[in-house]
């Protein structure tokens, strides 16, 4: 239900709708006959968050006027329009530019009084279609919400310098340990009557010196071979100690020992020539500790033997000529039976039995037609000679474990009786 806004001196900024859908009349707006029932609270209306007194409304409007003076370009409505307030029945409609709406999150108008905040033009929602705010926000809370400060701890370079100093001291200790070891190797090589130039070439080619200067020309093959033999023969016990040292150097890639040296016309890393010696020597140490040479062989799984098929000796075989003769005789009997049946009223089952009886008696006893069920021939599945037992003999052979056959009498086999002889 929509009603027009009517200014009045008594309301001074608040115009209420009729109570409980009461009939509205223009005569009630006369100054002489004012209806005091409009000033009373309607059903369900109380002094809640959306109920303001006249003094509170005036204070809020003064605050808005002050903010408009600071920002004359603000997109707020004029003061005359903001004084017209409209309330819906039981909170179902949203008033136009009410003081509550200025504090609501749906209002984009000027609401802060500090000149540091940026203002957007005011956005008002249409009556009866916008979402109703569940709780009115306090103006001071809204200002504090917009002025949240983010504090970040300043950068402290001393902390990073201390961490870097620790890493540098650790790397320097590792490099000093590594450089001490080649010095002993150089002394051993000098004892083997090697010139100092050759010893410096060997140490520099291995990439152990901090200068890591590569030789201009290819080194002598004798010096390389002697140095490799010296490392493999005299450093077998120190191989376990050498591997963690080089792993630490690989972890700290900031050391100056990561250069490459020229060897036989190709570039190789200084660590690639050292690690294979230590790894191979560690394997030899493990083999010496075990007392015998370890041969790593691939273990095979369990081999299942393949059963070979046994040859069947007792299965009768027929030549193709014998099979062709049996086929022709069978066809002749079938055609003769169709042309001159024995009994035309015997039916399909009787006719089949008569045909099978003829085939059974006319052919050789060694040959059995696949559809002939008068004899049971399991020669293909048995490997021993067939033995015939009576029922009692069969029970005695099975030690009378089947109690249901104890009371059955023994009876001999009877001859096969065809259906047409009955």
Swiss-Prot record:
GO terms for molecular function: calcium-dependent protein binding. Residues 255-269 have a biased composition (Polar residues). Residues 274-283 have a biased composition (Low complexity). The modification Phosphoserine is found at residue 195. Pfam families: S100PBPR (PF15427). One of its GO terms (cellular component) is cytosol. Residues 1-28, 61-135, 170-292 are annotated as: Disordered. Keywords: Nucleus, Phosphoprotein. InterPro entries: S100PBP (IPR026097). The keyword Plastid does not apply. It is found in: Nucleus. Interacts with S100P. This is S100P-binding protein. It comes from Bos taurus.
């Amino acid at each position: 239900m929509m009603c027009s806004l009517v200014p009045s001196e008594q309301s001074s900024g608040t115009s209420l709708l009729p109570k409980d859908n009461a009939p509205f009349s223009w005569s009630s707006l006369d100054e002489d006959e004012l209806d005091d029932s409009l000033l009373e609270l309607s059903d369900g209306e109380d002094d809640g968050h959306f109920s303001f007194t006249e003094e509170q409304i005036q204070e809020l409007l003064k605050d808005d006027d002050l903010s408009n003076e600071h920002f004359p370009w603000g997109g707020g409505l004029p003061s005359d329009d903001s004084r017209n307030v409209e309330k819906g029945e039981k909170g179902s409609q949203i008033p136009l530019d009410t003081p509550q709406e200025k504090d609501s999150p749906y209002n984009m108008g000027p609401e802060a009084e500090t000149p540091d905040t940026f203002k957007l033009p005011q956005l008002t929602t249409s009556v009866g279609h916008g979402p109703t705010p569940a709780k009115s926000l306090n103006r001071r809370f809204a200002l504090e919400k917009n002025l949240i400060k983010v504090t970040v701890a300043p950068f402290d370079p001393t902390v990073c310098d201390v961490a870097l100093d620790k890493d540098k001291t650790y790397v320097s200790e590792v490099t000093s340990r590594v450089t001490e070891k080649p010095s002993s190797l150089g002394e051993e090589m000098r004892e083997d009557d090697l010139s100092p130039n050759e010893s410096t070439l060997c140490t520099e080619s291995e990439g152990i010196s901090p200068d890591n200067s590569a030789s201009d020309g290819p080194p002598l093959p004798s010096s390389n071979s002697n140095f490799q033999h010296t490392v493999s023969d005299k450093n077998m016990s120190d191989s376990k100690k050498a591997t963690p040292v080089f792993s630490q150097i690989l972890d700290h890639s900031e050391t100056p020992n990561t250069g490459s040296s020229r060897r036989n016309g190709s570039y190789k890393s200084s660590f690639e020539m050292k690690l294979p010696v230590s790894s191979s020597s560690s394997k030899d140490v493990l083999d010496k500790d075990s007392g015998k040479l370890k041969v790593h062989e691939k273990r095979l799984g369990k081999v299942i033997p393949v059963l070979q098929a046994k040859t069947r000796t007792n299965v009768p075989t027929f030549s193709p000529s014998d099979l062709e003769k049996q086929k022709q005789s069978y066809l002749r009997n079938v055609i003769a039976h169709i042309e001159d049946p024995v009994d035309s009223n015997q039916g399909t089952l009787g006719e089949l039995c008569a045909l099978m009886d003829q085939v059974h008696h006319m052919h050789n006893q060694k040959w059995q037609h696949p559809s002939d069920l008068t004899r049971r021939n399991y020669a293909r599945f048995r490997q021993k000679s067939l033995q015939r037992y009576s029922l009692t003999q069969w029970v005695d052979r099975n030690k009378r474990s089947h109690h249901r056959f104890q009371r059955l009498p023994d009876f001999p086999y009877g001859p096969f009786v065809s259906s047409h002889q009955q």
